[in-house]
Amino acid sequence: MGKITAILQAAQQRAKEMNLSYEGALLPEEANEILKSAPGAILVDVRTRAELDWIGGVAGSVGIEWATYPGMKPNPHFLAQLEQQVDKESLVLFLCRSGGRSHLAATAATQAGYSDCYNILQGFEGDMNNESHRNTLGGWRAAGLPWKQS
């Protein structure tokens, strides 16, 4: 079994255990490996433009807001924007701050006919620690994975 297959199978098993409606749930390190090794894999960052500008993001990702800043109002054009930028047959990985919005995006994309959707658990910044700070408990940045500041 190849590395990509093993990672995707683990993510699919996780999704079954978590009773998720989309294909799989990846850890940040697994998502990074998929992006490096799986031809055609696409990372969709669903954080707000403000988050991308102020906090940073993953180079080469497609940015489509799930909700807009300020106010975190749902983006009524999310699926239309996704369809303009991402083929429905692509292996699509969704990322947000901590995994919540990306879960919603992966669910919506699956319902809209995307067949290979994965949520990146822990998100870009991870969960808050005891001092209410992010970037120390899980997440893309805390894992030391590549990212860029705008």
Predicted regions and their residues:
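Rhodanese-like catalytic fold shared by cysteine-dependent sulfurtransferases
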Residues: 1-41, 49-91, 102-150
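Conserved G/P- and acidic residue-centered "switch" motifs that form tight phosphate/ATP-binding loops
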Residues: 45, 99
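Short, surface-exposed ligand- or partner-binding patches at beta-edge/loop junctions that are enriched
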Residues: 94-95
